[in-house]
Amino acid sequence: MDDFRNKLRNFLNNECLWVKNVACTSFTKVYCATTAVSPFFKPISPQGVPDKHYINVTLIILKPKKSHPYITVYINDLAVDCCSTEILQVKPVPCSHFSLIYFGPLIAPPHNVQIPANLSIKASKKSHLTKNQVIFTSKVIHPERLPDGYKSASLIGACAWYSEGAIFQHFLSTDYMSLCPAFKEFPSLSRILSLLTRCDDLSCVPCYGEKIHVNCQSGYTDSDCDGKSNSCPCITSCTALKKDIVPITGHRNLLSLLFDATIQHNITSIKFFSPQTPTTVNNVFCGVLDTGETVECTCEAWNLLMFSDFISRQMIYNCQIMKRFCLRSC
């Protein structure tokens, strides 16, 4: 049990962002979290195998007057533990509906404690990570002047990077966004290149991310959720996993954000360079003309952003692949 509780504690501390549930009362606090499947913590279904692409967690906290708080943890509607802890810190995140909860070592509860029923009221919120949340919390970074300690990075997908808790990604500049008020897509370079080069198989995992993602902002994932994502940097054309030059398959209007107007209509493919550290846009990819000639993209529309720690955590917790890339076992 000690080994299980250590793994459970690490999972709760390092892979969950908490949403306060409307079932809270003055005496009972209820928090919910939804997070992608963990590389380190494996909840088991009644059939004996993991059977979902998400982990829904309900946390019920009771604080008796003369003892430490004790907590009951439900995962995907199954009670997995009732335990106590000497340390429990709840910190609301400013300007969001999230809370961060830190758990000290989990220990056995008093012998007379009864496991409370799952009190949470399931109401999946429809909010998603927005471009404004990214823009207002991120830093614009010059690729040649990366902050100290961030020179070593891991490539995510075709054009994003992770280093020391932060995601680096090119984002459409606010000046260009103001010129395209009707543009509704998540304005990351990863998303734009994905739209240009993805295949037409809607169940393709690399191109659409099916059964890989959750939306942790919702606090709960419905069983019929398709697990796709419109914002995760892991989404990459399945063809790009096999070769560097990938044909353009649709959304050609988006080429105006990447290339000079005089050559857009002649571009047939994208060539990916897969740089291993954050760099300028023209070192990430180029265009390929119908003649086979390569042409540089234009950089003016794009800023390299260093996402805040909190936004980076949201994106990591949303994705099984990002978790495997970015999280360490604790």
Curated annotation (Swiss-Prot):
Entry superkingdom: Viruses
TM segment ranges: none
Family stated for the protein in its record: Belongs to the herpesviridae cytoplasmic envelopment protein 2 family.
UniProt name for this protein: Cytoplasmic envelopment protein 2
Keyword Transmembrane carried by entry: no
Gene Ontology cellular component annotations, sorted alphabetically: host cell cytoplasm; host cell nucleus; viral tegument
InterPro entries, sorted: Herpes_UL16/UL94
Keyword Metal-binding listed: no
Keywords, comma-separated and alphabetical: Host cytoplasm, Host nucleus, Late protein, Virion, Virion tegument
